[in-house]
Amino acid sequence: MTTPNKTPPGADPKQLERTGTVREIGSQAVWSLSSCKPGFGVDQLRDDNLETYWQSDGSQPHLVNIQFRRKTTVKTLCIYADYKSDESYTPSKISVRVGNNFHNLQEIRQLELVEPSGWIHVPLTDNHKKPTRTFMIQIAVLANHQNGRDTHMRQIKIYTPVEESSIGKFPRCTTIDFMMYRSIR
């Protein structure tokens, strides 16, 4: 059992993007849900609006499946939950699994959440802080607060590390001979 990274209350994952070290890749994936109430599905989970949410409609575990077309490097998963708004619909126990497909998923994190309010940052790295490479991520809601049946998740974001480019890493021309040939006429 692990606890999610401690971040300042309500820390916006877009701050991660602004650092230039990660980018959001959720739009590159195919999303599916184990169940949802009409009008409370994937579109609401991905619309960048903290007032909308996915609401499950069935028995637990409630699943969010995120499938990539090719093996993808993932570093951080961010989930927005709000106990004050959702009460018994708020997840209290979440399992994060990765794999090539539904048949070989392995749990890499299990989280215990106590009345969460804001963004929950879940590192998808190994013991050496190396990001995970996977075709699929599954988020399973195993339990809710107050033994609630259905769940609400307001937003989910997935981040990959930004790879450094070799452009601009060449040494500068410093001698007169090199400077003569540094531009093309």
Curated annotation (Swiss-Prot):
The UniProt keywords, alphabetically, are: Acetylation, Cell cycle, Cell division, Mitosis, Ubl conjugation pathway
**Can you tell which superkingdom this protein's organism belongs to?**
Eukaryota
**What metabolic or biological pathway is this protein involved in?**
Protein modification; protein ubiquitination
Q: Which InterPro entries match?
A: APC10/Doc1, APC_su10/DOC_dom, Galactose-bd-like_sf
Show the disulfide pairing.
none
Q: Which Pfam families does the record cross-reference, listed alphabetically?
A: ANAPC10 (PF03256)
Its Gene Ontology cellular component terms are: anaphase-promoting complex; cytosol; nucleoplasm
List of residues that carry N-acetylthreonine: T2
The entry sums up its family as follows: Belongs to the APC10 family.
- Function, in words: Component of the anaphase promoting complex/cyclosome (APC/C), a cell cycle-regulated E3 ubiquitin ligase that controls progression through mitosis and the G1 phase of the cell cycle. The APC/C complex acts by mediating ubiquitination and subsequent degradation of target proteins: it mainly mediates the formation of 'Lys-11'-linked polyubiquitin chains and, to a lower extent, the formation of 'Lys-48'- and 'Lys-63'-linked polyubiquitin chains. The APC/C complex catalyzes assembly of branched 'Lys-11'-/'Lys-48'-linked branched ubiquitin chains on target proteins.
Protein name as catalogued: Anaphase-promoting complex subunit 10
Question: Gene name, please?
Answer: ANAPC10
